[in-house]
Swiss-Prot record:
PANTHER family: S-ADENOSYL-L-METHIONINE-DEPENDENT METHYLTRANSFERASES SUPERFAMILY PROTEIN (PTHR31760:SF0). The gene is rsmG. It is found in: Cytoplasm. S-adenosyl-L-methionine binds at residues 73, 78, 124-125, 138. This is Ribosomal RNA small subunit methyltransferase G. It catalyses: guanosine(527) in 16S rRNA + S-adenosyl-L-methionine = N(7)-methylguanosine(527) in 16S rRNA + S-adenosyl-L-homocysteine. It holds the Pfam family GidB. It comes from Actinobacillus pleuropneumoniae serotype 5b (strain L20). InterPro entries: rRNA_ssu_MeTfrase_G (IPR003682), SAM-dependent_MTases_sf (IPR029063). The keyword S-adenosyl-L-methionine applies.
Length: 205
């Protein structure tokens, strides 16, 4: 699995240390193990997890601006855990409303020695503890839902980072809250079939 990860990272031009690579492989092994009992992801094959979960998360890394981020509807820690491993200097809150997912994340953090992640069991609309430089998600079906439910989370300079498949301009026009479209970045994920985009949105000051 490590060789496959090395190859994917090279193709994506992502540079990580040996320790970071081992943490990513360890995370996939844990996810695969827990998935058999807890059904955390529909992806069953660890090699596929490397592409669809790890690389698909890591390609966002170079676009992150700021120091503290929240991953909303993180599921088993995606994209939050791969991004936290790749960015040990940044802080991440991983939010999910399902207990088994947060239990898995806590276990993974402990086993892998990841110290820059805070897992939180909460519904997004009820989480008002702090604001963030970036609100990340690949969980929302529509941009309007993401902005609507997470509007209280970015700080004045903060941005929404929405990970999408196909980007539809009409989705931005359907957003009800005041919002600015900063840019849409096509993402290239090695060995992943289909389009991926990062949509950057900001709240007008």
């Amino acid at each position: 699995m490590r060789q496959k990860l090395d190859r994917l990272l090279e193709q994506a031009q992502i540079n990580l240390t040996d320790q970071q690579k081992e943490q990513l492989v360890g995370f996939v092994r844990l996810l695969d193990k827990w998935n058999k009992a807890y059904n955390l992801t529909s992806v069953r094959n660890p090699d596929e997890m490397l592409v669809k979960h790890i690389l698909d998360s890591l390609v966002v890394s170079e676009h992150l601006q700021g120091n503290n981020f929240i991953d909303v509807g993180t599921g088993p820690g995606l994209p939050g855990i791969p991004l936290a491993i790749a960015n040990p200097d940044k802080q991440f809150v991983l939010l999910d409303s399902l207990g088994k997912r947060i239990t898995f994340i806590k276990n993974a953090l402990r086993e892998l020695g990841i110290t820059n992640v805070t897992p939180v069991l909460s519904r997004v609309e009820e989480y008002k503890e702090q604001t963030f430089d970036g609100v990340l998600s690949r969980a929302f079906a529509s941009l309007n839902d993401m902005v609507d439910w997470c509007y209280h989370l970015p700080n004045p300079q903060g941005k929404f980072y929405a990970l999408k498949g196909i980007y539809a301009e009409s989705e931005v026009q359907e957003i009800k809250n005041p919002i600015g479209l900063e840019k849409v970045i096509p993402l290239s994920v090695p060995e992943l079939v289909g389009e991926r985009h990062l949509v950057l949105l900001n709240k007008p000051n």
